[in-house]
Amino acid sequence: NGLTNVDCRREAVGAAAVIPTALSLGTGAWLASRIGERLRCHQHGFAHVNHALTGRKCEFGTDRAIDAQHADLRRGWSLLNQLLQGRVDEIFTPPWNRCSQATADALCELGFRGLSRDAGAAPLRLGSLQSLPVHVNWMKPRLDAEPDLHALAAMIAEALRRESEVGLMLHHAVMTDRDFESFGELLALLRSLGVVEFVTMRSLLPATDALRRTA
């Protein structure tokens, strides 16, 4: 896998957002064996299915009742933990980076600790959830299907000027060899500067003594 290879070579850290129903037994075992200090995994929706009746795609949006969302969140968590041998962080990334207030409420009730969405997403009442925003989408600035490195550098620099913690989102399933090569070069550059620290999303979560969630 290009993502895990790049991370290991550059001593960076990553958080894989995993779709529960898309993970096979074999891939789950392979991924679980690689989870550690530098590679973490968390829940990415349930089946990555669009339930929006109109407008932009959304699996956990306002068109779904909280009971339906609650059930999918719980089932997804249970399935993911079975496949990844219990090595799942209490973080949720909604498909298409969109979710509703009902989603946040259900996540709190189930004991999740973090919610990762686009930094510009509409505000939600997060309760006990820690916001873990994405500031830069690697796949957004493109030049002829290749990464626009100048635009990416500018976006990252601007985010670093504004924020003490910057989230960079990858789409490893659709990234090209050139994407991985460029990403590896970026990691090497950032590390060489000596002023950037790579941290896991899990490390940004507040400490907790107990979780309410049940499998």
Task: Set out the residue ranges of the language-model regions.
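A conserved mid-domain beta-alpha-beta active-site/ligand-binding segment of alpha/beta enzyme cores
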Residues: 132-165, 169-178
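Surface-exposed, active-site-proximal loop segments in enzymatic domains
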Residues: 6-15, 52-63
